[in-house]
Amino acid sequence: MCLRIGSSTRQNGRVNKEAVELFCAILALATLAGGIITLAALALEERMTWTNAWLTQVRASGIWIICLITTGAMLGSLYFSEHVGFAPCKLCWYQRIAMYSIAIISFVAALRNDKNIVRYTIVLAPMGLVVSTYHYLLEWYPNLETNVCSLDVPCTAVWFRELGFVTLCFMAGCAFITVIAVSLAVMRGQKIDSTSIHQEN
């Protein structure tokens, strides 16, 4: 009887983990879609009518959007490492440093309504994106490994691959791309506001 209960618990745990993996994958793709739309709106600003409405919303809530994305990514990474038991490699830690830093400073900035924080997010996010992109390539092409990681926790290990291509570092990359897009939108909005003020004076 005890063996059956233990087996059932492990099975339920596995189902829950797989459900979380799928949920996080879908959430990452939705985040990426938002980032791509924002980048497209920036490229087409003043050429298409829908871009103004989209960018207005992004600029108004930009810091909270960045905070929400990075905090979600931070909590997700902690769930997989601390609860599920996925050991983070050295590249994972580099991505965490960038992601966690953005999450903390954006939360403080959001509380203070300080949009100048994008000066830092626009630096940290690309750095994280470079690492996550390289990490993602290693997952598909292990021969690109340059002895960056240890043998105990190799960077080429793939804990899961949802929908055939979504891995943990892919999710991180989606978050970094969207943070970059939102940061650019906020920065351009600040520039437009500054130009308008100078013209009025």
Task: Show which residues each predicted segment covers.
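Cys/His-coordinated zinc-binding microdomains
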Residues: 93
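Secretory/periplasmic and organellar redox-cofactor proteins
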Residues: 2-90, 99-102, 106-201
